[in-house]
C-alpha cells in the first residue's frame, strides 16, 4: 500500500486554540484554553483514542511521580504496571487514573487507537514524504524544542503494525505510544497541537 492511500485523521484542530475538541472553531474561539490532563485524556477517548497516564516532570525537570525515573524517562514513563498494555478507552478507569495522578502526562496508544505518527528530524524529510503522496494532517509540536513535530495519521485497517527508528532522520511509529498535549516535557515546554 502506498503512502498516498493514507487518510487524514478525522480530528481537525482549531487554528486558534490548537485543540482537536474545540467546538467554537476559528473566529468564534476564545483562544488557547489550558484544559486539565484528565479532561484532555477524556476528550481523546471521545475521538476513539486509547490513553495511558505517564510520569510528569516537576518544576526542576526531575521525576514528579515519585518513582525516581531518570532524565530520558521523565515525562514519558507509563505509571501503570504493564505500561502501554494497560491503555484504556474506559471513562471511569481514566478518571480514576487522573484522580490518583492529577499531573500525569498523557500517552496515546497508537496501535489500539488506529494511528501512526511520523516524527521527522528535519524539514527535508517532510518534503520527501510529501513527494510520496503523504497528505497534510494534524501536528503536535513536541516538547523537545524547535524542529520536533509529530504528524498524526489514521492507520488503514490493513496496514502493518510497526516502528521504524532512524534516529538521525525520522521515526515512523504505529506501535507503542506517543506523549500527547498538554503534557509537559522534561525541559518544561508543553506539547501543543498546532
Model-derived regions, located:
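Conserved phosphate/metal-binding and DNA-contacting active-site motifs used
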Residues: 2-194
